[in-house]
Amino acid sequence: MISAVEKIREFMKEQGVNFLLVNSTNKYLEEYTPLEENSRYFLTDFSGSTGDVLVTFEDIYLFVDGRYHIQADLEVNHDIVSVVKLQTGQTFLDELIKKIPQDGTLGIFAKKNSQTRVEYLEKNGIKLKYFNNDPLDKTIDYDSSNIVKVDGVSVEEKIKNIDIDGAVLITNLEEVAYLFNLRDFSKNYSSKIRGKAVILAGRARLLDDIDDFVESYNGKIFVDKSTINAYDYKLIGEKVEVLSDSPIKLMKSVKTDDEINHYIEAFKRTDMAVKAIRDYIENNDNISEYDIAERLEKEFKRFGAKSLSFKSIVAKDKNSALAHYSKCSKDEILKDGSLVLIDCGAYYEQGLATDITRVFVKGNPSELQKRVYTTVLKMFLNAYNSDLKVGYDIDNLARKIYSENEIDGFVFNHGLGHGIGVSVHEYPPNLSKNEMAKVEIKDNMCFTIEPGLYNEDYFGVRLENSCYMKDGKIKSFVHMNYEKKLIDFSMLTEQEKQWLKEFEVL
């Protein structure tokens, strides 16, 4: 049987391109694309949620950010795949461009790249050749019979103030699910529905695809270039008008008071599930990562979860240095002194994703474990209790705290936080060194604060609370206690001790 690598290079030869971009996403540009739809996974065996591939006839370059440096090294065949490790502040597109010579042409799959991305590449001198179909694609039928209605502001109320002379096309799946108050809990790790939407003349319609609508409608069609794929953009042609942002994006990110109240209740149940796991770890011997992950899902279901919001990360010792470790091995048994990082979340009745990370220790911790844990805790406490409202600035503050308490060999190699909602990763808001984080976080926006420190020779610690902004102050949905055994209280200032005391309830 021909391998994926052979198949993709045969395609390149037939199409006359020496460079081909293979994506981790699908035509909806989903971040968490199921692996059975993930062409990058077929090529590289890398199972992370993000990270695209440049294929040449000599090499395959896998680009990954700091969350996946170690995981990529562990999963790929290095005789075939070269891992390009993006550092904080580096972007995938800029590093990709460096690998394309001036006279080179890059083949791309139009349905799997946003219009914003292709315009950036062209602006930077990259000649593109578009292909409509990816030869590695597998046909996956979507069963819409599982879609359910959830409570929320009506579609009519949401769109009544959209005053645009033409049709507005919504192509982001989170926005579509939000707009129609529809969810699909039939698969783990998502509550989104699949489809696109058009808003026209005070009404909204749900579409499977846009082809028939584009052909029959003669007016202007307004789009968000960051969420529409290049195929759909070109299909619209001269009818296209560009929006600076989808009118649904900001609306979705600023939660209603009812949504905030749902989240408060959902996180109470999430806290209880994690507390049950803490007790399970404390009171049982010879348990594995796999045992904990299985028990965790049962606890979520016991407290009413519809499904998990992402695949739980249960990582002990060195595995915890992989920011998005996802194996949960039966062979990784907790021993005395084992550190275990648990990053998890669930969907409840409203289909909004919860997200929390805690780190526990089996038995007695080492001094290094306590030092790293307490440093991460200091980063969280200072970021959480600041009066800052811009994600970029909050991220900088956490990094400043680490620079004042640096630990040799441990790195903080990801952003401080992300928005949450219908998906576990949403924008806005964003807390990172990225330019898109340089905007103010508005009241009722929901987001995570999750500093972490990692050393692949030892372990990693990440502490994550999902939060919201209220009256210009950050409030936490999460109230699960921190691991007292891992806190070196001598490292905390009196202010930090007081903050910790005020925060914890479980």
Language-model features: locations:
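Active-site neighborhoods and metal-handling regions in enzymes and metal-associated proteins
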Residues: 1-506
